[in-house]
Design a protein with these regions (language model features):
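Acidic/aromatic-lined carbohydrate-recognition and catalytic surfaces
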Residues: 2-155
Length: 155
């Protein structure tokens, strides 16, 4: 029987607080390095704040959907490495020690759209998208909601 009262060490750090070339941390190379560091330090737990799309004031606690992931945490360099974004060139940023969500949104949205446009045919042709839609039935309604929200200026 496994003991449930064993002490474990850990850290609370939101993904956007990780270092990296973008205006906020992502689930990319820095996240992998951080997990390796935690393991080497004997830590067993990494607790993060909610990772859904942020709401008013970029609060992770005011998400429009508890099931969706925040697209700004997608690492564009990994999309490039996997062939979804072959022409990606990261914009240079001064290290300020603070996440800049306004700049992040302005820079990242066009790249994410470009990755989709570049890979759309491949993603739709292999049948995985249909399987994915069946596994996640809430996705269609959420996508419609977000499209309408954007169309009507985030109202």
């Amino acid at each position: 029987m496994e003991q449930t009262n064993v002490r474990r060490g850990g850290v609370l750090l939101h993904i956007t607080s990780l270092p990296g070339p973008e205006c906020a941390g992502t689930l990319g190379e820095a996240a992998y390095r951080f997990v390796d560091f935690l393991q080497s330090a004997g830590m067993r737990i990494w607790q993060v704040l909610p990772v859904g799309p942020t709401g008013y004031g970029e609060s992770p606690y005011q998400s429009a959907c508890a099931l969706a992931g925040n697209p700004y945490m997608i690492d564009l360099a990994l999309l490039q490495k996997d062939g979804y974004l072959p022409d990606y060139q990261p914009a240079p940023h001064a290290e300020t020690g603070r996440a800049d969500f306004e700049t992040l949104r302005a820079e990242k949205e066009p790249w994410l759209r470009r990755a989709y446009q570049h890979s759309r045919d491949r993603l739709l042709s292999d049948g995985a998208f249909e399987v994915w839609q069946k596994q996640w039935p809430w996705l269609r309604d959420y996508a419609l909601f977000m499209a309408l929200k954007q169309k009507f200026n985030q109202v």
